[in-house]
Amino acid sequence: MRIIANKNKKNKKKFPWKIILDNKRCIPVPSQYNFKSNFIRRHGCSLVGFYMALRFRGIKKNMQQCLSYARRRLKCGAKYPLTEICRGINMICSGKPAVYHKSMSNDRIEAHLKKGHMILFEEGNPIHTVVLLRDNKTGRVWRFSDGRKNVTTVEKENKKKCTNEKYKGIVIVK
């Protein structure tokens, strides 16, 4: 896995980073605050996770297509909960690649990351969805959120987990 800065002047603002996986698949990292749609700017973190998970599985939809699909087929409160995002990924992708868990131990999350899976994680206070991926060459765990990338640990992220009954959870995308 490599993470490179986007050099394209047309879409650099909306997608500042690109993740290139070992199988040469490219996942742009969206910055939700630079989209026209008011819903994406305010509550788009779960849609960013939805978009990145579909790209991880090899399905190319843009953010607007993800939003229109979610509006037509998924249930929404203030934002889309991870249960609905998981259901949406499984509707689009063949083989049911996404699995939802209410909570998970650090060891189990670490094991999934070592296998090369993508993790969508709901943080609390404020409620926010982030994407976790592991670089197998360096062993670092990367956290993607709001068009930014940070190195983190599973323990740090698990301490920040959401406790709200409706929104809490973890989605593993294989």
Roles of regions detected by a PLM:
Residues 54-174:
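Conserved active-site-adjacent core of cysteine acyl-enzyme catalytic domains
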Residues 1-75:
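Active-site-adjacent structural segments surrounding the nucleophilic cysteine of cysteine proteases
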